[in-house]
Amino acid sequence: MIPKIIHIAWNDKEVLKSDAPLIKHGLKKLVELNPDWDLQISDDADIEAYLQEKMAEDYELAKPLHIVAKTDIWRLYKMFFEGGLYIDIDRLCNVSLAGLIDADTRQVLPTCRNHDFAHDFMLSAPGNPIYKNAVRAWLARRKDGHDSIYFLGAQTYMHVITHTLFDTIIDTNPGDEMFDRMRKAINAVPGLKCIEEDPPHLTVIHEGFAGNWEQMKRDFYAQNGLRHWTGEW
């Protein structure tokens, strides 16, 4: 069973008090529509402490990295040990989680169109081997010297899911036919759901147009004195 916990990583634990449109149409609606779920916000210090506890000596592999890269490995440990929902703070929401899962659901794996498996939305029972394997792959790639946020994060996640479920590594953007086959195979497994999304407006937790999401996100980051991890803005 998936525990009703929402994991958010953000540098301000009072973010729900924000009047930013991104939060109004996202995190606030998520909390409002799912009152029986426990929201847990972890700031940078919480993430550092959690990684030190769970990684032990392997923490040295994460220590020099950007906080975004640390959050990527943190979410894998969180999902494996605790389960629930990990979601990026910039996701829009107007649909309850109640219609997405039931007592038999073990994992929901959205796909970002036919590009890759969504790395910003993880919904699972604890003890999922996908997350265990993802941690192992992350550690192995760090030991090999990799430090790219995208490669260690979203791309490694795609590689691990496909290797765990299909015994072969399938790279990002494998084509419509391949993703159709993968979704069909995953949905045939009891307890698993794989749903195609067209983010940011058409996802498993949002339907319809909510305004200029890109501008909402940029404004929210600016209000918090942050730059996007890509450095583009």
Outline where the language-model segments fall.
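Solvent-exposed aromatic/hydrophobic patches embedded in short alpha-helical segments
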Residues: K70-G84
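Glycosyltransferase-associated regions of secretory-pathway enzymes
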Residues: M1-T71, I87-W233
